[in-house]
Amino acid sequence: MKEYLTNERIRAKQVRVVGPDGKQLGIMDTREALRLAQEMDLDLVLVGPNADPPVARIMDYSKWRYEQQMAEKEARKKAKRTEVKSIKFRVKIDEHDYQTKLGHIKRFLQEGHKVKVTIMFRGREVAHPELGERILNRVTEDLKDLAVVEMKPEMLGRDMNMLLAPVKVSA
């Protein structure tokens, strides 16, 4: 968090003073502004050091700083951490198993996670990548309302991978 110059540490000769209510009090000597702040039992805080003259505000600095820290903490808490979930299919997947895994993918997408869909090939199945593409295309078609394909199907060793991301909901 940024530190501000306060009270006696302000070195400018004159400052533009903003009162605790946000109203402009005008340009005055720093000593005069400091005396005014002390009369109100508040701090003089240099908030605009690069302005001409610098801008100082009369406020309760420790209270303001605490509120800023709490707001920062709350923002970090609300920042969504997206995870990449992984679902694996086999080439010869049964319809019920497919629907179950599709349900898992839907739930992950609704929670805002990305989903890596993997088709695992065994033995000679690797000679028929079109079977894996068919399953991935079906998944894409079944989830077209919930997801967008972030990474198209691609072979990696004995696996074919595709990455789905949740559709952004426009509010």
Swiss-Prot record:
A GO MF term: translation initiation factor activity
Family label: Belongs to the IF-3 family.
Any one of the GO BP annotations: ribosome disassembly
Upper lineage: Bacteria, Thermotogati, Deinococcota, Deinococci, Thermales
Keyword Protein biosynthesis: yes
Organism field: Thermus thermophilus (strain ATCC 27634 / DSM 579 / HB8)
Superkingdom, natural source: Bacteria
Protein name stated in the entry: Translation initiation factor IF-3
Cellular-component GO terms for this entry: cytosol; membrane
Keyword Ribosomal protein: no
